């Protein structure tokens, strides 16, 4: 005797299909939220914080907003990376290491300005050595990824090595003179912002620039800016001098022009992820 057919709600294949569709909807919603938060962070909050660098109270407010938003973007982006990619692939390892390296810059920068604002001459504590160890471990991860392949990863590993050399030299010297802490703050915060611009470049300049160039141009430009700001802040009496204003102005100008292009790119209502780099959609600007 033939049994009665299963109701749709009891069919395992349909239950699994509905569950998958529900998960996909949540995934897409998180991507949308990630994008809605990401673009203002890159093109409004961060430039506003840079422009307010000579007004400590205002700069601090925008800086806190940048820290909180970037933390949100890192957490959601990391979740999307783990949820949307095969964990055994090189691309997955690259994304995890690269994104943590970029995000961690804001932590080092925040620690530096916290010490800079203290009365007297701060000295490195156990936390500072732990952060230095974290930076070293992250750079080691970049070196492992870069050893497999990829010119941009090799450049980022080189940048990381330079940061490590500066890090341990400044720790050895006990953050003296105190202006070192201001240099550390500008170095790391700017590095975090150029990381953000790198992610946006990967997403929106996939067809306009060669594959390696879209990854590295923010680092090349950022290296010049960071070198200029570091030189401007070498003396405690001149942490916000003319050269620093020029470097910050150039960075904001690039951000404004870049924001205009991104707005145009989004308005075209077509996929903007470069071929072969869809994995980067899980970061600041997912698609």
Task: Give the ranges of each region predicted by the language model.
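Alpha-helical membrane insertion/targeting regions
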Residues: 17-287
């Amino acid at each position: 005797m033939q049994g009665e057919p299963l109701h749709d709600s009891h069919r395992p294949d349909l239950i699994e299909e509905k569950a998958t569709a529900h998960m996909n909807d949540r995934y897409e919603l998180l991507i949308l939220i990630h994008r809605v938060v990401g673009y203002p962070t890159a093109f409004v909050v961060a430039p506003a914080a840079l422009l307010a660098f000579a007004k400590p109270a205002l700069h601090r407010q925008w800086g806190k907003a940048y820290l909180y938003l970037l933390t949100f973007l890192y957490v959601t982006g990391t979740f999307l990376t783990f949820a949307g990619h095969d964990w055994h692939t090189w691309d997955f390892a690259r994304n995890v290491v690269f994104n943590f390296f970029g995000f961690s810059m804001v932590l080092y920068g925040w620690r530096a300005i916290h010490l800079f604002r203290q009365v007297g001459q701060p000295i490195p504590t156990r936390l500072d050595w732990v952060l230095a160890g974290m930076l070293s471990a992250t750079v080691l991860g970049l070196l492992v990824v870069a050893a497999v392949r990829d010119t941009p990863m090799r450049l980022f590993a080189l940048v990381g090595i330079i940061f490590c050399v500066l890090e341990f030299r400044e720790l050895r010297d006990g953050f003296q003179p105190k202006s070192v802490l201001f240099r550390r703050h500008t170095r790391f915060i700017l590095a975090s912002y150029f990381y953000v611009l790198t992610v946006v470049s990967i997403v929106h300049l996939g067809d306009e620039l060669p594959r390696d160039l879209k990854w590295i141009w923010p680092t090349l430009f950022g290296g010049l800016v960071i070198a200029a700001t570091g030189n401007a802040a070498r003396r405690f009496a001149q942490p916000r001098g003319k050269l620093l204003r020029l470097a910050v102005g150039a960075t904001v100008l690039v951000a404004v022009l870049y924001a205009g292009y991104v707005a145009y790119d989004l308005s075209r209502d077509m996929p903007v992820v470069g071929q072969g780099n869809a994995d980067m959609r899980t970061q600041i600007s997912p698609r």
